[in-house]
Each structure stands twice: as C-alpha cells, then as structure tokens.
Amino acid sequence: MSGTILENLSGRKLSILVATLLLCQVLCFLLGGLYAPLPAGHVTVLGSLCREDHARQNDTSFLLYSRGAGACIPVTREEVEQDSTKMANELVHVFQMPLPRDLRDLDYSRWQQNLIGVLQVEFGYDSSSELREPPRELQLTIDMRLAYRNKGDPDNGWKLYAHGVEHRYLDCVTSHVGPTETLYSCDMIPLFELGALHHSFYLLNLRFPLDTPSQMNLQFGHMHDLTLTAIHQNGGFTQIWLLLKTMLFPFVVGIMIWFWRRVHLLQRSPALLEYMLIYLGAALTFLNLPLEYLSLVYEMPYMLLLSDIRQGIFYAMLLTFWLVFAGEHMLIQDAPNKSTIRSRYWKHLSAVVVGCISLFVFDICERGVQLRNPFYSIWTTPLGAKVAMTFIVLAGVSAAIYFLFLCYMIWKVFRNIGDKRTSLPSMSQARRLHYEVPLDQKVEDWAGIVYFYTKAFFFQLHKANESKGLIYRFKFLMLATLVCAALTVAGFIMGQMAEGQWDWNDNVAIQPTSAFLTGVYGMWNIYIFALLILYAPSHKQWPTMHHSDETTQSNENIVASAASEEIEFSHLPSDSNPSEISSLTSFTRKVAFD
C-alpha cells in the first residue's frame, strides 16, 4: 500500500535530502553575502546653471549640457544675484549622468536595469520680502526634458527621451537666516523613473517658468542649489541575481515534470493539494524565468511592471498554498465531499485576492502610467502621497496579520494531531510505529520538539530498525513552513519600505542586504522543491519487512495486523475521500480501532 515519499522515504535517504537542501540554502546566502554588491546604488549630482536664449525656450529639441564639446557656458551664483530679475525664465538647471571619475567619463551599463531620480530643492527669499515663510504643500511647476546618447555618439548628439510640464508639492523648513536672504530646504520629491536603463548617458534639463497671470511659481523667491539623486540597480547584483535564476529554473521545471508524471501514474484524479503544488511550481517557474537577459539587447521599459506582476502572482499563489496546505491537514470537517478551493477556502482566500488586486491596481496606476510618462508619480500630490502611504502601511499590516493567522492554523493542526494521538495506544504495533517514533521521554515543549527533530533526522532515522515517525516528520515540515512564511513576510515589508523611502522620507535608510534577498529567493525554490519531492506519490509498499532469524515471525504478525487495519486508513485519495494524499491526513480524520 503506497503513500507519499514523506512517509515512505527511509531515514538515511531523508537525512541526505534534508542535509543537501540545507547546504543549498546556506550557499544561497553566501552567494549574495560574499559575491554580490548592495542591490542598489546612487549618485548625487549637483545641478549646473546655464543661461538659455529666449528665442529657443519653446523648442523642446534644444538641450543644454555642461560637459563635452559645445557645452553651455556655466552661470555663477554671483551673476544670478547681481541680475535685477534673478535671470527669471532664463536659467536652466542641467544634470548630466553619470558623473566622471578620475578624469574619466563613466557610462551606465544595461546590467543596471533601471534608473530613478529624486530631487532636493533649496531656495531663498530676500530678507526684505514680506513673504518670509513659504506655505506648506507649496506647488512647484517644473518643465522637465530628459535626453540620452550612447557610446560613439558626438558630445552634442543628445536625443530627447521625454518632455513634460509637471507639478510637485514641497514641504520646506528654514535652513539658514542671513542678513540679506533666508534659505529654505525642502523634502525630496520624485522626479522620474525609467524601467529600462538602455542607454549610456542621460541628460536632464529643468526649468522653473514664472508667469504672473497664472501665478506660476510666484510663491518662490529664487532657486539656489538643486541636488539630483540618481538611484540605479547595481550591475554586479543583477549578474548574481540572474545567475541564481538561471541555475534554479531548470531544476524546478524538472521536478515539476517528475512530480506530475508520478501523480498521473496513479489510478485516480489528482488531489487538491497536488493541484496546488503544481500551480505553485508553475508560479515559481514564471518567476524564475530569466527574462532580464532580453533587456540586455532590447529596450524594455515595461520590465519593472512585468517583474512586479510576476512577483505578485507568486506571492498570491504562495499565500494561497499555505492556507490550503494547513487547512488540508486540519481536516476538521466531517463531510466526505471532495475539497475544493471554492467550497472550503473562499473566506480565507478572499482577503488574499482583495489584497493582491489592490496592489496590482496600485502598481498599474504608478508604473503603468510611467510607460508613457516617466515623470509621473502618484506621490506628487498630497492626496496621492497619502493614498500611496496608506497602501504601503496596509500591505505591511496585512502581511503581518496573515502570518499570525497562518501560525494560528498551524497551531490548530498540531493540536488536532495531538488530540488524535490519544488513539495510538489502541493501535497495533505496526500502525503505531508508522505514526510515532518511540521516545525515551515525552516531548511536550517546543525546545524538546526541535531537539528531537534534529536527533530524528540526523541520527535515528537512518537506522533500519527504527520507526519512521511520520508525525514528527510532518511537524518538522510545518515548522519549516513557518520559517519560510516569516522570512517571506519580512522580505515583503522591507521591500515595500525600501521602494517607498525615497518618496516619503529621506531620513530613513532601509535597504535589504544582498545576502537576505538571495537567501530568501533561494529559500522559496528549496522549499517548493522539497514539497514537490516529499508530497509526490511513493511507489514503495508499506510496511517494509525486515528479515532476521530473531524478528521474522514477529514482523509477519505485525504486517498481518496492519493488513487487517487497511479498512481504517487510506494512504491515497479514494473516491469516497479524494482530498487525502497521505496516511497522516487519514490519521487526523478518524480514530483507529485496533
């Protein structure tokens, strides 16, 4: 009578499998910690001032640059101060990226994937001005022109990438009070976001037009220093990340094919948990697919959006699977009907579906619009910033609540199994030894359980005459599920905060380390890889007879006793109860009678 590999695999083989997977997990952490740089880097660029010809102010193809042949003549701050109108409608703030280093021009690499720009504004008022304190949520109108050129292009070969007149709202504080003017420093504001870093050099021209009839920018005195922070993904991290994806992708595809083939060899339809496992493997395969290689050849500004969609699908599938995984082993219902997502889990999964749809809509509103206008950001208006912050906070709170609910479900599974263990003394020896490893002392606390798991996996389970201890194997797997869920939730919350920190607070420095990111990503693959192996149907018959001169007769009696109990348990799904895929689920559904 066959079951799953989890219950039929020998202790020696199980120990080797667990040790190998743990070694792979350690290697994933070391790969990010020892060889990968930080996931993201940034360059701070101080804007250069250039004076524009009035005749070409409306010519969007006219671009000013500060380095190279044909560069503009820079305007000093003293010249601006001496001008009676502060050169209103004539000044252009120029930012050229990346900056040179050691008298050598640097260029962006396509391995760096994306580019985000945030701006910090500093402006001042004359001390004689009546408007000494700027109002909060001060509206600033900016004429933005983003251009690019590649290696081999002439210094003046800039091509317009995007142009727009956008509004930004500033919150400023007094930074310096002098005898002639008062300076104000403002919070960082999002400026642009490029989903593909396809070109070698980028140029940004900023103009702050003044217009009396429309009251445009009249609340400002005069601009001082403008600082642009250009954030990019580190190319070295991208290479390590794609290397990890490239290595993991074929292994997951291979184990999925192997798992589904073993399921279809059985004379039954796949169970719900088996369907969920193959769906989870498919979502992970979609996430592992190294599509980023295409961005090294083609310009794909939608890659950020596509990456978010792929990760969102995986998160939704993983969260759904954990609820079903715990629920299928609770089995507290008495109805013999076949388990389905709609019949049993619609209440639990409705929150997951609503949360995923909300985040998808939020992402489309942000990065979907940026495909057409890279200067757009939902953070630019006070209302949009509050909505975006609300989404981030709710996402983090929801993730924490989900983890607590999952802990509660797994606790109920453990309690349910503990209640059913009271029936073990009434079972035959073969049936009892299949579920529980004989212990010298009771293991009731968590520390004892963890100690026993280690002992059972690496010392006792390899002995041929020892019991397989299905209950403790399952509990070990559930604890591994909790660890995986905890790290996933922590990574999700840190990712949301790291993504939004440049938009809502420049004083917060949150950046997940490369070791954490590669470790969690490897953990997802290793965890799902292990589930596909352990929950695959086994072709081994149970129980196995051990022949020796002293034990042959007793084993024959045990097997005969176990055979008489086959009517009490069903290791694999049957027509009457198709949701059971292992003897443990049968054990949690009914009490055996010896």
Curated annotation (Swiss-Prot):
Any one GO cellular component localisation term in the record: presynaptic membrane
Main location: membrane
Single Gene Ontology MF annotation: Wnt-protein binding
Result after altering residue 250 to S: In wls-2; Homozygous lethal
Disruption phenotype: Segment polarity phenotype (cuticles are smaller and lack the alternate naked regions) and wing margin defects (a reduced number of posterior wing-margin bristles and the even bristles distribution is interrupted). Heterozygotes die as pharate adults with appendage malformations, such as lack of arista and antennal segments, rudimentary legs and wing-to-notum transformations.
Lumenal side: 35-239, 292-311, 366-390, 495-514
Residue ranges of the TM segments: 14-34, 240-260, 271-291, 312-332, 345-365, 391-411, 474-494, 515-535
Keyword list, A-Z: Cell membrane, Cell projection, Developmental protein, Endoplasmic reticulum, Endosome, Glycoprotein, Golgi apparatus, Membrane, Postsynaptic cell membrane, Segmentation polarity protein, Synapse, Transmembrane, Transmembrane helix, Wnt signaling pathway
Family: Belongs to the wntless family.
Name the UniProt record assigns to this protein: Protein wntless
